[in-house]
Amino acid sequence: MNSIPVLTVKDVAMLDGVLGDFLKKAEADLTVVIDRGGNVISQFGDMSVMDITIFAALAAGSFAATRELARRIGEIEFNALYHQGNGSHMFMNSVDDDTIMITVFGPRTTVGLVRFYSAAAAQNVSNLLKTLQRGGHGLEFTAADISAAPIFADPAPTAAAVTPAK
């Protein structure tokens, strides 16, 4: 898994522009860009109806489970998933090897319209994230940076600190 790019306010504004344009064209309600681990990279739209963090984690799990189902029938993965509800629907598509775009929409649009515009939006998001990873602002955040280790623990004593002075 590639490193998660560190996003500045300007970077977020660029992502918001891509996602906002997509939502307008697709007439969808919400789009969220996540990594395959379920971490939110960017979001745009009406987020008042759900906890985005939990939503992202569950969507990543669903995408991972479907990836395994695809492998069981000889496919590498399914690059898109559609969940149809009575009033709300969800379309998930792969942005790249590390990223997923989730779109929530209602009855005022169709899955075909969402799917059509999501292809271009996913490509734009992928290109933008690749550019940000190359640029990096001199900062990097990798999956190894996420750990259960205590942040404020005293470091282990060094050999110099343990050896008595003569």
Predicted regions and their residues:
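Acidic, low-complexity cytosolic segments
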Residues: 1-30, 37-166
